[in-house]
Amino acid sequence: MQRMTMMVCPHDTAKDPERWFLFSQYLSQRAGHLVHFEQSLDFPEFQSKMAQADLIYANPQHTLKLFDEHGFIPLTRAASLFDEAVLVTCAECEATVADFHQASVATVPSMLVTQVALKSLARSGIAPQSLQPASTWMGVVQAIYNGEARFGILYKDFYEGMSKLSRKQVRVVSETAERSVYHCFMLAPRHADHVDALRKVMLGMADDERGAAILRDLHMDRL
């Protein structure tokens, strides 16, 4: 039985990584490969190892990098999950989306979800004057909490994964519903001959009782 290492975007393993162990176990039993889930504690670790992995559940940014620079093959994606943004302000501030126009907005500019937010704002004729760069989403929260920025853009999944105490540091003004970018399962090119078999197993999970239960725990209806 061939061994495969599976890695998952750290945002998706921050809480209850056991779900992904069950997912890898299911693939091992159904696809004929020993799929080993290797958890990354943070993004620097994930980014340093992802090109050596065999199977990856990657965010949109990393999906493009894996495809363009390393030849990874898209397998499938969660049918109903999209990467969206939340627009936030300081906890004690009263604000509307219109207040983002010509304002300085803290965000992580390199992440695609920032572009999702800007596209959503532009549709309403709103254009921030400048983007105040942060290296991480928590850096955006800290900039707002410390009074260095009044407005911010956050990755929705990051915000929802924050502790209740951390969420109290900001106030949500709005959230996007663009449904344009998403995480994707990517397979290393050295396993190109296994694409069809793996994809068949993954696409059939929703029609199998145990597979469907695993997907539900991952907040996925079907692949």
Task: Outline where the language-model segments fall.
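Extracytoplasmic small-molecule ligand-binding "clamshell" domains
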Residues: 1-64
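Bilobed "Venus flytrap"/periplasmic-binding protein-like clamshell domains
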Residues: 5-26, 40, 84-141, 146, ...
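Generic structural signal for residues in well-ordered beta-strands
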Residues: 35-37, 130-131, 170-172
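Short helices/loops that flank or line small-molecule/ion binding pockets
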Residues: 43-56, 137-157
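Acidic, polar ligand-binding/catalytic clefts
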Residues: 45-99
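A ligand-binding cleft/hinge motif common to bilobed small-molecule-binding domains
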Residues: 59-69, 143-169
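Ligand-binding clefts/hinges and TM-proximal coupling segments of bilobed small-molecule sensing domains
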Residues: 110-131, 200-223
